Amino acid sequence: MKTLLLTLVVVTIVCLDLGYTLKCNKLVPIASKTCPAGKNLCYKMFMMSDLTVPVKRGCIDVCPKSSLLVKYVCCNTDICN
């Protein structure tokens, strides 16, 4: 009985992702990637001259401040960018 219980615990640990992993879109929205440890935000970067087309997408640790030329939009849920 102990062996069966131990086996179930090991299988559960192996099958489950014990740490939360964030997924963010790459530049092409249909392609996503799993963010590395410490990168807990997704972002989109736009040129201020054209706010309709993102220039860059990905994972980031801290959301940068927007400037006169570039706007950043950050979020923290899977594929939110």
Curated annotation (Swiss-Prot):
One BP annotation, GO: killing of cells of another organism
SUPFAM superfamilies listed in its UniProt record: Snake toxin-like
One GO cellular component term noted in the UniProt record for this chain: other organism cell membrane
Pfam families: Toxin_cobra-type
Tissue distribution: Expressed by the venom gland.
Keyword set, alphabetical order: Cardiotoxin, Cytolysis, Disulfide bond, Membrane, Secreted, Signal, Target cell membrane, Target membrane, Toxin
Intracellular or extracellular location(s): Secreted; Target cell membrane
Main location class: secreted
Entry annotated with the keyword Mitochondrion: no
Disulfide linkage: C24-C42, C35-C59, C63-C74, C75-C80
Signal peptide location: 1-21
One Gene Ontology MF term: toxin activity
InterPro entries named in the record: Cytotoxin_Cobra, Snake_3FTx, Snake_toxin-like_sf, Snake_toxin_con_site, Toxin_cobra-type
Complexes and interactors: Monomer in solution; Homodimer and oligomer in the presence of negatively charged lipids forming a pore with a size ranging between 20 and 30 Angstroms.
Family: Belongs to the three-finger toxin family. Short-chain subfamily. Type IA cytotoxin sub-subfamily.
UniProt name for this protein: Cytotoxin 1b
The organism of origin for this protein: Naja atra (Chinese cobra)
